[in-house]
């Protein structure tokens, strides 16, 4: 008699982690948890533990988090970012400072995910929140901080106007990260990616 098929165990055969990524590319492996079962994420965590590979688990829901922590109990978990990092201590920062700017408090979770990703990629990263264009004075009050950053990541929903505003104030590269929050009028659901 054959054993019943176990989808999570069968899926483990298809998980091919890139254990050499950090050396080859300069950044660690990441496991995108959304869309995976907790068992599949646990299988990935087991493979990571066996290899000792630095890894980020992103978009981790409560069941994913429980699965990872059952295998890697010392993994660092950030509820706002919905992310786990293992090993829990990030590398020493090197290179220029990253500034993550969140337009509104609804953008905070994505902004925190960006900040922690930068930290685990070995960059010093600061987070500025609730500086959307509805209160221009708030972003202008941070002008010195904006201008001292090596790169700026702007996380914004609504109409997505903040990245353009910030880019006009600084000489550093500005990366726009659209979110699906807000009720802006531009182009329906596609407003902040156009």
Where would I find each of the regions flagged by the language model?
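Glycine-rich oxoanion-binding loops at beta->alpha junctions
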Residues: 83-85, 124-148, 190
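Arg/Lys-rich RNA-binding interfaces used to dock onto structured RNA substrates
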Residues: 11-12, 20-24, 68-99, 103
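Conserved small/polar residues in nucleotide/adenosyl-binding loops
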Residues: 193-194
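Long amphipathic alpha-helical segments
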Residues: 1-75
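Glycine-rich phosphate/diphosphate-binding loop of Rossmann-like nucleotide-binding domains
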Residues: 94-137
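Short glycine/serine/threonine-rich phosphate/pyrophosphate-binding segments
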Residues: 39-41, 107-112, 136-137, 156-165, ...
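Short glycine-rich or small-residue beta-strand-to-loop segments that form or flank ligand, phosphate
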Residues: 28-31, 97-103, 152-154
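Glycine-rich phosphate-binding loop
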Residues: 141-179
């Amino acid at each position: 008699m054959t054993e019943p098929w176990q989808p999570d165990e069968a899926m483990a055969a298809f998980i091919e982690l890139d254990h050499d990524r950090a050396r080859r590319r300069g950044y660690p492996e990441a496991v995108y948890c959304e869309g995976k079962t907790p068992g599949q994420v646990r299988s990935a965590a087991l493979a990571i533990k066996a290899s000792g590979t630095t890894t980020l688990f992103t978009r981790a829901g409560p069941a994913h988090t429980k699965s990872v922590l059952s295998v890697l109990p010392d993994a660092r978990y950030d509820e706002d970012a919905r992310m786990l990092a293992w090993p829990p201590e990030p590398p020493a920062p090197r290179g220029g400072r990253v500034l993550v700017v969140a337009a509104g408090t609804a953008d905070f979770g994505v902004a925190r995910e960006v900040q922690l990703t930068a930290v685990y990629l070995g960059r010093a990263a600061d987070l500025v929140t609730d500086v959307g264009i509805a209160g221009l004075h708030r972003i202008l009050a941070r002008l010195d901080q904006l201008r001292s950053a090596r790169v700026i990541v702007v996380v914004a929903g609504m109409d997505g106007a903040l990245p353009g505003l910030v880019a006009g104030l600084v000489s550093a590269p500005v990366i726009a990260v659209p979110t699906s929050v807000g009720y802006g009028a531009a182009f329906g659901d596609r407003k902040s990616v156009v």
